[in-house]
From Swiss-Prot:
Transmembrane segments: 17-37, 61-81, 113-133
GO biological process, any: protein import into mitochondrial matrix
Native source species: Drosophila melanogaster (Fruit fly)
Record localization: Mitochondrion inner membrane
Name by which UniProt lists this protein: Probable mitochondrial import inner membrane translocase subunit Tim17 1
Presence of keyword Membrane: yes
Its job: Essential component of the TIM23 complex, a complex that mediates the translocation of transit peptide-containing proteins across the mitochondrial inner membrane.
Length: 179
């Protein structure tokens, strides 16, 4: 599964680090703006300035944390691509687990293991959803043979002659063998 829209590996680390920083800074900025707005004294002016102060104080830190996660994840992912000589979902799952473990290493072994488990499970979930979506969406781009197209056309004509709606036949409300 090659991703042709991505940079090659050494540059991918920098690209992912920057993208993660931007995502963390914007998302963290929005979250901090809401938090600062809610925690400020009453009055619209105070609330707006409180929200802006919270954004200035914390959004860069959140963006930096996201950037560290993105750079670590990409470095491990590129290392796995180099050593395994293939790019598949297992690289992302292993990278997520390893990144979670590395970033939680200062807090102790149990926290490190639980963060690695959460990182691996989260990336497995993301990769699994991506595989399922690509599997089902690929079927809509499948080429239909002329014989199959003719069979579908005949079935549609029979449905129209019998007065059966296409939705009823599609969703199993009627036995298609009776047509």
């Amino acid at each position: 599964m090659a991703e042709y829209g991505r940079e090659p590996c050494p540059f991918r680390i920098v690209e992912d680090c920057g993208g993660a920083f931007a995502m963390g800074a914007l998302g963290g900025g929005a979250f901090q703006a809401i938090k600062g707005f809610r925690n400020a004294p009453s009055g619209l002016g105070y609330r707006l300035s409180g929200g802006l102060a919270a954004v200035r104080a914390r959004s860069g830190l959140v963006g930096g944390n996201f950037a560290v996660w993105g750079a670590t994840f990409s470095a491990i992912d590129c290392s796995l691509v180099y050593f395994r000589k293939k790019e598949d979902p297992w690289n992302a799952i292993i990278s997520g687990a390893t990144t979670g473990g590395i970033l939680a290493a200062r807090t102790g072994l149990t926290s490190m293991l639980s963060s690695a488990l959460v990182g691996g499970a989260l990336l497995a979930l993301i990769e699994g959803v991506g595989i399922v979506v690509s599997h089902y969406s690929a079927d809509s781009y499948r080429q239909v043979s002329p014989v199959e197209r003719q069979q579908r056309y005949k079935q549609e004509l029979l449905r129209q002659q019998k007065g059966v709606s296409p939705l009823a036949a599609t969703y199993g409300e009627i036995d298609s063998s009776a047509l």
